[in-house]
């Protein structure tokens, strides 16, 4: 068994060794390389497939030989550096590929030119065989790849650095590739044999019919292969950067060099920005990532005139100085700092160079570097800016760069070596004689490394031992602990650099911040001093590096040079000649290398920065294609002119030096180069297809089905299938709609149609806009098209204005004169003069009539016609247009248009020409009307004549019957009217639906009342204009005519029958007979009324004349046809109209307005009245009744109500008490009944249509216990009882005179001053409190008793308090609006947060706008001060907490919808500071009466400047946006910062003090800018300012109108028309100049919203969070633990003091048990360094820190733990764990090793894989 296991183990280990051996791995990687196919395979396959015969065999052999030879050369080039340099450079591939491709095509197309005619088999003169060999060889060297990734080939290169026996690996990988290649060729051969032997292919009809197909295919195969080769070559070369045309690294000249030199902190391993390189070209596409590109290069290759591009200029080495910051040695950073004079602000320091040096540059250029600069550093693909820390713009290169470094005393290959450092060291070694080129042996290096490590370890150990010894002597521990080293600016004053700039502070504060000189300091003296200082530091840094080696010979010379330089510079530091000396030295020892630029600018930034002194020469980021269109030039000298700048919209504006306002017009074309840095290599967009001529966005082929297709792609079967299916369904469907759902179906259909129409209209608008954009871009892209189009437009404008239109006017008036009509010269000329031709920019910005836009011939022009002339056949009076439909008014065309190239009119630029109104269209319309009237009249006369003829034929028989029918009919009417007095409910006169089918079921006959109500309200909401409603009217008219005819026939048949209510069927147009009788009676009194009211009859004579005409018409024409019909019509129409006139005249005495028009067709629905009245009706329940009131008059119904002596209106109370906007009840009628005492006068409703007031009142009534988001106890204790009683009395005030009310309120306030028992008198500023009560008074009055007032425009009377007068003047009072909040501006502009009237928005509002309360975040303390703080403090505290809960529980979304937003502020305030608000109030109330005194101090310090009261402005800004919960963190952070200032003091007192100081500071600003800065920095750290999105478009439209108005002398007409069209919005008019941030936020232009960026948690924030938890814990401990023991440290013996301190487990305030770990005496950096050095100690592996442990003065801390029996068990485990983790195996050590030891660039990419890849340390 043992033998078997041993054999098995050996076999496994043997297999593992074989698998891991270099040969097997090489074979495997080589085999994988076979699958990376290049274009050379095309030649190989062509030789295999096509060639036949002996010559074909030779070609096959030569192709295979060339192919294998090329691959072998590629493998060898990996190992052999010269061959790698020859083949690996990008320019070698370019130089070889282009000529060879030309030769190859020439060879294929002119084959016989090279053919010498010799066909001998062994002849070497046959060049075709040699060419096959060369093709395969050269194209194998080109190394293009067909597959997407070339990773398979690079696997060999990667594994090269892992193995030691590199030659064996290369050989084995080549053999593996050869095996794979042989297998592949065998597989191809087998496929060819299978094709030849396959009968199915031979039996193909097409192949058999075409005999010469194979021969033709073979002859054209060369052409096919050449095409494929060309495609692959272009495909591959497209990914290789062109070395000639790519833009070189454009450094920001000497300025940016100075920027980088003044960086305070430098890291050893620079961060690489950007992801892994995305280029997919050849292996050597990126020269900087190659292994031997810089290492093995001949140092003599670059001579003295070699140039390195900086800022796009080639400069010789004499122009540059050299300054480095990183050294390879020791892998430790070399820090440099410059102590600059003056302010270090964001400006730039210019160093002036001589022009002579620049002129010599071109002549000294080597021609090779002009064409191929392989050391060129291409730009990254994108540029990511960061305003705070600006890192260098890096190339998108791989993170891995291979170079040699020293690790563990050996030279090893590091895969994360900084490439810039490698290049830099090589250049230094070539050019500088001070650096040795001799390489030390491996033993010397290892000894040197060991020596240095020992020295460092000794130093650190000694320092540590010294600290512990000092501790033994009794010194304090705090003095012995090592502190962090800080960089000091001034040793005398002990001023340190800020933490963020301090290079010695690593980790959290690390970053690069650029400093510059301020412009005031830039002068020649400072520049020279600065240069002098720079040279001193440069020489010092360069030469100081070389004094580190003790073993190296010739050190004396270097030390001598160093001393000489230092002595000279230090002695003569003030001499100006030093600059010359240092420059001479500089020429010998220094050279500047290319530096990464820090800030790249785009085109917009370049234009904005043109006014600056140190502006950049050219932009380096390609921005969107834009054209700058100047729209206004300010000739006046006005430096404070406003600039409109908004870079997010399509149009942006900026000012130039000449005072030009310009819009930037962006092209709508797809711009693939947007935001790409110039010179950066473009990644190939393989997954993007451009299918259209104008394609705005790039699309992946994956989403091709979602793109609008071309015509030949537009055939979509799914749409056709849908249409066919719908048609099939519609054929089989049975439309059976019941009567009850008929109206609902109609409304749904109409709504659906409307939605579809709106949707279609929007889609059509989008389509038209797309077409317009394409047309505009076409004009913009064609050369000289804009100039041609502009000239044509100007010619068309002149032709239209001065030739075409005048000729049309003359022709029209001449024709009118010929037709004997009055000419209209004046009207036509007036309209012609009104037409304006305004020149606009290309995107439609209006300029003026005479001024052309700048560069209009190149940029384009539009001509806008304002008030275009319309030639009319006659002019109507303008009064007739007033009574038009509102829908028709909306559909009227705009009174402007744009001129097209063809002279047509278009509504938008490049839009489709609109249809012009024809001159003859109104003439034809009038003629058609006249013809229709003539036809109608002729038809009536013909029918009358026919009826007369029939009448005369039957006259003798009908005369008897006529008299009998008339007498019986009159008798029945009289009887019916006499009976109707007994039934009062019939006075309502309801009409009944006539049912055509009397045998219908009872369930189906009455339509549901609810559906009718829905139908009526939907019609009401559309202003009674609806297609379905008109359709219904037409159907009702037809039904009426039918029912009238049927009813007349029934009346004639039922002459002798009685009329029963339950059985009769009357048409919808007929009234009940009771109503007819009443009308008949009322008609008797008509003569008396006419005599009394002659004047009114004269006014209303039109109606009486109309009635008389109708009577005459009935008597003369229709009496002959049918006598009963005449009687019925008379009783239906004439008495009804008379009664309406009587009602009108009766109510005219009470109200001066007409209630109801005669013949009113508007449907007013009294559905709820009918619903209530049905309860006490005397009708039979089984009768089929439906109450249709579509034509019933309101006046008639209420007249009937007024006639009743005793009426019970209890059932109608719900209607009459409706507090919202009435949908069916007129206010005047309710007022009339209120006067008569029918119901309460308070039930009167306003004309306010929205239900906003109703919601407001219901909310206030339902939530009266909260009273505006305050708890009930707060509200009850807010003020004294007298004031509450007076406020409640005020709710019942019915006096409409607001001036009296204001006087009454003023008396109240003055009376308040005299009260001494008021509890809030202790506050210092009584005026503020009075104003608060006054404010609440106004709010309550307006909100609760609002509907009792008509035309309520509140005028605030001034009131005097403390001898300070405040006057308000009111402006823009709109009497047409029922509610008009006065937007009064206080004259003295003292707009503090306590002002009553708020002017943040215009007073013209369409909705209720109570904007009085200003609840701020900190104003909650002021609310607290209103309350009696001396009593019930605990309840108040809990109520405040409850108040916040109430705010959270309330649905804020509903509040914001209809409520005024001031109350929502409290909710938002709680969201922002959910923790801080209650804590603050708890702290304040702990202080008892201090609250009032604090408020005294605060109120005394208030400033009257409105823009400095930041808290109020903050609240106004907070209300504008919904806040995210991210704000909690920032606000807590700011407030907790004040809590943690001093932990030893009481937390609450400190919080109150800091808050009070902060509030004082906030009021003591000198300018608006200070307020704005404080506002942004202190409060809104995680907020961002942004434009209101809806304002963007409005502002741009306003700017377009302003451009025209500024140029006009009389712009009034244009202003009015533009306001009517909606182009000019008045609410964003900037009337004032220089608006501050607070005012912009008031107007809603700037909005503060929370940032949506990801917030990186700072170390401070994490610390605050942890301390916050500790504070809470500590607070609990302090409450529970009343007795404390003081801890002390024995000064004599360190270990004894630790033993004494074992009682600390019971004392939970101190954490001194950390001192059990002695290493804590050192700083973390030195601690880490000491551990690593101890682990490197290879000689004494077991002696770990023997100096520390074996010291006599300190006992081993492990014994202390053993001896201590008083420790808790948990604490014991914790200390043991800490001793185990802390000194030896901390995670921090791994991170440190990862960064500094293994040269990893970015610590966040730390992974264990890299540790495994790196060489292991030797363990001895």
UniProtKB/Swiss-Prot annotation:
Chain positions covered by the region annotation Disordered: 250-310, 744-763
Keywords: Chloroplast, Membrane, Plastid, Plastid inner membrane, Protein transport, Transmembrane, Transmembrane helix, Transport
Protein name (Swiss-Prot/TrEMBL): Protein TIC 214
Domain of life: Eukaryota
UniProt function note: Involved in protein precursor import into chloroplasts. May be part of an intermediate translocation complex acting as a protein-conducting channel at the inner envelope.
Subunit and interaction comment: Part of the Tic complex.
Phosphoprotein among keywords: no
Naturally occurring in which organism (per UniProt): Populus alba (White poplar)
Topology relative to the membrane: Multi-pass membrane protein
Family: Belongs to the TIC214 family.
């Amino acid at each position: 068994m043992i033998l078997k296991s041993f054999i098995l183990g050996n076999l496994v280990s043997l297999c593992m060794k074989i698998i891991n051996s270099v040969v097997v791995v090489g074979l495997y990687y080589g085999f994988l390389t076979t699958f990376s196919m290049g274009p050379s395979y095309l030649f190989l396959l062509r030789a295999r497939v096509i060639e036949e015969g002996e010559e074909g065999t030779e070609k096959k052999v030569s192709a295979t030989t060339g192919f294998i030879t090329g691959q072998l050369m590629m493998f060898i080039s990996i190992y052999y550096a010269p061959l790698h340099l020859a083949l690996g450079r990008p320019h070698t591939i370019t130089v070889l590929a282009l000529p060879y491709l030309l030769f190859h095509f020439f060879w294929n197309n002119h084959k016989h030119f090279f053919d010498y005619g010799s066909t001998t088999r062994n002849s070497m003169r046959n060049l075709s065989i040699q060419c096959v060999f060369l093709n395969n060889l050269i194209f194998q060297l080109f190394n293009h790849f067909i597959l997407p990734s070339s990773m398979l080939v690079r696997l060999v290169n990667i594994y090269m650095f892992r193995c030691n026996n590199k030659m064996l690996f290369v050989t084995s990988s080549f053999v593996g590739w050869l095996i794979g290649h042989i297998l592949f060729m065998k597989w191809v051969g087998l496929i060819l044999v299978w094709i030849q032997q396959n009968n199915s292919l031979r039996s193909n009809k097409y192949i058999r019919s075409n005999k010469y197909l194979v021969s033709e295919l073979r002859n054209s195969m060369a052409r096919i292969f050449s095409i494929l080769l060309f495609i692959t070559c272009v495909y591959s070369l497209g990914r290789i950067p062109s070395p000639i045309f790519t833009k070189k690294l454009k450094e920001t000249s000497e300025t940016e060099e100075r920027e980088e030199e003044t960086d305070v902190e430098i890291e050893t391993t620079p961060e690489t920005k950007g992801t892994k390189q995305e280029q997919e070209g050849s292996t050597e596409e990126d020269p900087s990532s190659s292994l031997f590109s810089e290492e093995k290069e001949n140092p003599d290759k670059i001579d003295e005139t070699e140039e390195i591009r900086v800022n796009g200029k080639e400069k010789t080495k004499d122009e540059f100085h050299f300054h480095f910051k990183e050294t390879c040695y020791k892998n430790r950073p070399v820090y440099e700092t410059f102590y600059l004079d003056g302010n270090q602000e964001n400006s730039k320091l210019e160093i002036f160079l001589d022009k002579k040096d620049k002129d010599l540059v071109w002549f000294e250029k080597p021609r090779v570097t002009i064409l191929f600069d392989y050391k060129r550093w291409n730009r990254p693909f994108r540029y990511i800016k960061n305003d705070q820390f600006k890192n260098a713009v890096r190339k998108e290169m791989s993170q891995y760069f291979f170079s040699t470094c020293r690790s563990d005393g050996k030279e090893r290959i590091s895969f994360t070596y900084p490439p810039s450092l490698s290049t830099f060291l090589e250049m230094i070694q070539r050019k500088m004689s001070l650096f040795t080129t001799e390489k030390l042996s491996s033993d010397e290096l290892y000894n040197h490394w060991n020596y240095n490590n020992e020295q460092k370890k000794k130093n650190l150990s000694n320092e540590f031992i010294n600290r512990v010894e000092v501790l033994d002597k009794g010194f304090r521990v705090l003095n012995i602990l090592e502190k962090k080293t800080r960089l000091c600016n001034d040793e005398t004053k002990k001023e340190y650099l800020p933490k963020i700039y301090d290079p010695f502070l690593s980790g959290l504060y690390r970053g690069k911040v650029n400093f510059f000189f301020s412009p005031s300091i830039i002068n020649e003296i400072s520049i020279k001093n600065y240069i002098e200082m720079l040279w001193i530091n440069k020489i010092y840094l360069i030469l100081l590096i070389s004094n580190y080696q003790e073993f190296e010979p010739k050190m004396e010379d270097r030390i001598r040079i160093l001393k000489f330089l230092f002595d000279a510079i230090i002695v003569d530091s003030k001499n100006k000649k030093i600059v010359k000396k240092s420059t001479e030295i500089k020429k010998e020892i220094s050279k500047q290398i290319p530096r990464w630029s820090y800030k790249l600018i785009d085109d917009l930034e370049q234009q904005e920065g043109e006014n600056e002194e140190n502006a950049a020469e050219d932009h380096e980021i390609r921005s969107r294609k834009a054209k700058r269109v100047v729209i206004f030039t300010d000739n006046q000298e006005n430096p404070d002119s406003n600039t409109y700048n908004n870079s997010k919209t399509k149009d942006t504006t900026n000012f130039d030096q000449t005072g030009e306002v310009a819009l930037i017009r962006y092209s709508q074309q797809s711009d693939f180069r947007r935001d790409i840095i110039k010179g950066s290599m473009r990644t190939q967009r393989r997954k993007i297809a451009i299918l259209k001529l104008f394609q705005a966005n790039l699309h992946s082929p994956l989403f091709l089905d979602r793109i609008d297709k071309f015509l030949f792609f537009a055939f979509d079967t799914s749409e056709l299938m849908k249409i066919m299916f719908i048609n099939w369904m519609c054929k089989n469907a049975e439309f059976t709609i019941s009567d009850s759902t008929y109206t609902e179906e109609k409304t749904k259909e109409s709504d659906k149609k409307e939605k579809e129409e709106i949707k279609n209209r929007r889609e059509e608008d989008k389509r038209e806009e797309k077409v317009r954009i394409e047309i505009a871009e076409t004009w913009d892209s064609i050369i000289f098209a804009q100039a041609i189009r502009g000239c044509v437009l100007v010619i068309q404008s002149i032709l239209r204005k001065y030739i075409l239109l005048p000729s049309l006017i003359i022709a029209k008036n001449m024709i009118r004169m010929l037709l004997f009509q009055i000419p209209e010269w004046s009207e036509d000329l007036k309209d012609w003069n009104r037409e304006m031709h305004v020149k606009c920019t290309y995107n439609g910005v209006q300029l003026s009539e005479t001024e052309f836009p700048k560069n209009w011939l190149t940029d384009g022009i539009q001509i806008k016609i304002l008030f275009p002339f319309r030639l009319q056949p006659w002019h109507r009076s303008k009064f007739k247009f007033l009574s038009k439909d509102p829908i028709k008014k909306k559909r009227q065309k705009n009174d402007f248009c744009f001129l097209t190239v063809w002279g047509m009119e278009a509504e938008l630029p490049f839009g489709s020409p609109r249809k012009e109104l024809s001159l003859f269209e109104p003439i034809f319309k009038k003629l058609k009307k006249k013809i229709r009237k003539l036809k109608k009249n002729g038809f009536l006369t013909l029918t009358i004549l026919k009826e007369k003829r029939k009448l005369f034929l039957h006259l003798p028989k009908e005369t008897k019957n006529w008299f009998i029918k008339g007498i019986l009919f009159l008798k029945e009417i009289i009887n019916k009217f006499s009976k109707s007095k007994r039934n009062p409910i019939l006075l309502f006169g309801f009409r009944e639906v006539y049912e055509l089918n009397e045998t219908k079921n009872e369930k189906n006959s009455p339509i549901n009342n609810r559906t009718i109500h829905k139908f009526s309200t939907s019609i009401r909401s559309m202003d009674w204009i609806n297609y379905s409603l008109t359709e219904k009217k037409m159907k009702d008219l037809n039904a009426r005519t039918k029912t009238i005819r049927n009813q007349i026939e029934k009346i004639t048949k039922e002459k002798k029958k009685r009329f029963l209510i339950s059985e009769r069927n009357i048409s919808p147009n007929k009234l009940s007979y009771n109503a007819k009788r009443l009308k008949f009676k009322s008609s008797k009194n008509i003569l008396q009324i006419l005599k009394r009211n002659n004047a009114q009859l004269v006014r209303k004579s039109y109606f009486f004349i109309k009635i008389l005409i109708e009577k005459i018409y009935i008597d003369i024409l229709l009496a002959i046809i049918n006598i009963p019909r005449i009687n019925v019509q008379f009783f239906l129409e004439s008495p009804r109209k008379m009664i309406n006139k009587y009602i009108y005249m009766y109510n005219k005495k009470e109200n001066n307005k007409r209630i109801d028009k005669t013949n009113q067709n508007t449907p007013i629905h009294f559905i709820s009245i009918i619903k209530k009245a049905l309860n006490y009706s005397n009708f039979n329940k089984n009768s089929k009744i439906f109450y249709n009131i579509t034509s019933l008059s309101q006046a008639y119904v209420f007249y009937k109500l007024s006639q009743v002596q005793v009426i019970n209106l209890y059932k109608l109370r719900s209607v009459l008490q409706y507090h919202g906007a009435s949908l069916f009840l007129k206010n005047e009628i309710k007022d009339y009944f209120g006067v008569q005492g029918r119901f309460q006068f308070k039930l009167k409703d306003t004309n306010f249509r929205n239900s906003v007031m109703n919601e407001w009142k219901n909310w206030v009534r339902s939530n009266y216990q909260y009273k505006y988001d305050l708890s009930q106890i707060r509200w009850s204790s807010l003020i004294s009882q007298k004031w509450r009683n007076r406020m409640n009395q005020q709710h019942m005030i019915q006096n409409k005179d607001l001036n009296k009310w204001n006087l009454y309120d003023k008396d109240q306030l003055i009376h308040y001053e005299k009260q001494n028992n008021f509890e809030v008198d202790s506050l210092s500023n009584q005026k503020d409190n009075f104003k608060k009560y006054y404010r609440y008074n106004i709010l309550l009055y307006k909100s609760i008793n609002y509907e009792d007032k008509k035309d309520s425009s509140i005028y605030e009377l001034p009131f005097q308090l403390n001898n300070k007068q405040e006057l308000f003047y009111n402006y823009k009072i709109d009497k047409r609006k029922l509610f008009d909040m006065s937007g009064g501006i206080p004259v003295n502009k003292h707009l503090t947060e306590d002002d009553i009237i708020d002017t943040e928005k215009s007073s013209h509002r369409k909705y209720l706008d109570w904007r009085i309360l200003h609840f701020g975040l900190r104003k909650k303390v002021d609310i607290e001060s209103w309350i009696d703080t001396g009593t019930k403090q605990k309840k108040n505290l809990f109520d405040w907490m409850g108040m916040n809960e109430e705010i959270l529980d309330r649905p804020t979304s509903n509040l914001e919808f209809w409520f005024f937003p001031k109350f929502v502020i409290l909710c938002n305030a709680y969201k922002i500071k959910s923790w801080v608000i209650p804590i603050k109030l708890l702290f304040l109330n702990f202080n008892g009466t201090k609250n009032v005194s604090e408020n005294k101090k605060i109120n005394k310090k208030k400033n009257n400047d409105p823009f400095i009261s930041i808290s109020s402005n903050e609240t106004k800004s907070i209300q504008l946006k919904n806040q995210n919960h991210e704000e909690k963190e920032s606000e807590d952070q700011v407030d907790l910062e004040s809590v943690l200032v001093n932990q030893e003091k009481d937390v609450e007192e400190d919080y109150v003090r800091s808050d009070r100081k902060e509030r004082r500071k906030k009021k003591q600003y000198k300018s608006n800018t200070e307020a704005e800065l404080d506002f942004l920095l202190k409060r809104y750290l995680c907020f961002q300012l942004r434009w209101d999105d809806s304002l963007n478009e409005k502002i741009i439209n306003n700017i377009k109108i302003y451009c025209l108005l500024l140029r006009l002398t009389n712009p009034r007409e244009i202003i009015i028309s533009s306001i009517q069209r909606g182009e000019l919005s008045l609410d964003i008019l900037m009337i004032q100049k220089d608006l501050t941030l607070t005012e912009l936020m008031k107007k809603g232009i700037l909005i503060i919203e929370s940032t949506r960026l990801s917030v990186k948690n700072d170390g401070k924030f994490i610390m605050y969070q942890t301390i916050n938890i500790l504070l809470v814990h500590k607070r609990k401990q302090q409450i529970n633990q009343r007795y404390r023991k003081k801890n002390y440290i024995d000064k004599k013996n360190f270990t004894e003091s630790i033993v004494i301190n074992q009682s600390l487990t019971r004392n939970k305030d101190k954490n001194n048990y950390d001192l059990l770990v002695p290493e804590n005496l050192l700083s973390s950096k030195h601690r880490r360094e000491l551990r690593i050095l101890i682990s490197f100690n290879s000689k004494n592996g077991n002696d770990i820190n023997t100096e520390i442990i074996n010291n006599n003065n300190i006992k081993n801390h492990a014994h202390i733990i053993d001896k201590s029996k008083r420790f808790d068990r948990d604490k014991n485990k914790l200390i043991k764990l800490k001793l185990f983790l802390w000194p030896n195996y901390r995670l921090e050590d791994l991170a440190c090793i990862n960064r500094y030891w293994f040269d990893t660039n970015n610590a966040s990419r730390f992974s264990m894989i890299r540790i495994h890849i790196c060489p292991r340390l030797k363990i001895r």
